[in-house]
Curated annotation (Swiss-Prot):
This is Accessory gene regulator protein A. It comes from the Bacteria. The keyword Transcription applies. Required for high-level post-exponential phase expression of a series of secreted proteins. Keywords: Activator, Cytoplasm, DNA-binding, Phosphoprotein, Transcription, Transcription regulation, Two-component regulatory system. The modification 4-aspartylphosphate is found at residue 59. Residues 2-125 form the Response regulatory domain. It is found in: Cytoplasm. It comes from Staphylococcus epidermidis (strain ATCC 35984 / DSM 28319 / BCRC 17069 / CCUG 31568 / BM 3577 / RP62A). NCBIfam families: quorum_RR_AgrA. The keyword Nucleotidyltransferase does not apply. One of its GO terms (molecular function) is phosphorelay response regulator activity. GO terms for cellular component: cytoplasm.
Length: 238
């Protein structure tokens, strides 16, 4: 899930970015801070390119000709179930969100920093839960990567390949923009879906995310720029 922050106060924006990045890093959620800006048009343009639902933290009062509520209304035209959270110092403006029918997830008031952090994290947790539920309803294939006391849910389409780890009984999932170490078995992963193929003793690849194959050097290149080796026997089977 991609996260967008539109806030015209630079200090406030940087504080929100810090909260979001720390949450993603510590909790290892399948999320990415895609954009933090004071330009509502930049958020709108990038939101149109999403293949999945987004999560938007929007300041209601922006120093632009498009305020946060109007921005949310425009986002709703192409992301009807996205998570929209308004961040504001003006509680009296919240009624406008009902006028524009944007169905906001939450209203967070800036006045209390500790409350701000807690509410942002609550919204991210709720957005993550909604994403899992929507993925099941829309038959989007996901895999649970177990990391001991917690798990990370990842969509098949985000996986480039799996690799054996130097640590016993652990694997590394190479995703579009990050890596996750987890407990697993390559043999079992290769049997999950037809798109997964064990091309080497140490690798299971996602055929759907292959960019190209160098058969001579036995190297498989992926859409995110990474690569892995294939065995002599299996390179032709990919």
């Amino acid at each position: 899930m991609k996260i967008f922050v539109c806030e015209d106060d630079q200090r406030q924006r940087e504080h929100m970015v810090s909260i979001i990045k720390n949450y993603i890093m510590i909790e290892e959620k399948p999320m990415e801070l895609a954009l933090a800006t004071n330009d509502p048009y930049e958020v709108l343009e990038q939101s149109k390119e999403l293949n999945d639902i987004g999560c938007y933290f929007l300041d209601i009062q922006l120093e632009a000709d498009m305020n946060g509520i109007k921005l949310a209304s425009e986002i709703r035209k192409h992301d009807p179930v996205g998570n929209i959270i308004f961040v504001t110092s003006h509680s009296e403006l919240t009624y406008l969100t009902f006028v524009y029918k944007v169905a906001a997830m939450d209203f967070i008031f800036k006045d209390d920093p500790s409350e701000l952090k807690m509410r942002i994290i609550d919204c991210l947790e709720t957005a993550h839960t909604r994403l899992k539920l929507l993925s099941k309803e829309s038959n989007v294939d996901t895999i649970e990567l177990k990391r001991g006391s917690n798990s990370v849910y990842v969509q098949y389409d985000d996986i480039m390949f799996f690799e054996s780890s130097t640590k016993s009984h652990r694997l590394i999932a190479h995703l579009d923009n990050r890596q996750i170490e987890f407990y697993g078995n390559l043999k079992e992963l290769a049997q999950l879906d037809e798109r997964f193929f064990r091309c080497h003793n140490s690798f299971v690849i996602n055929r759907h995310n292959i960019e190209s194959i160098d058969s001579k050097e036995r190297i498989v290149y992926f859409k995110n720029g990474e690569n892995c080796f294939a065995s002599v026997r299996n390179v032709k089977k990919i």
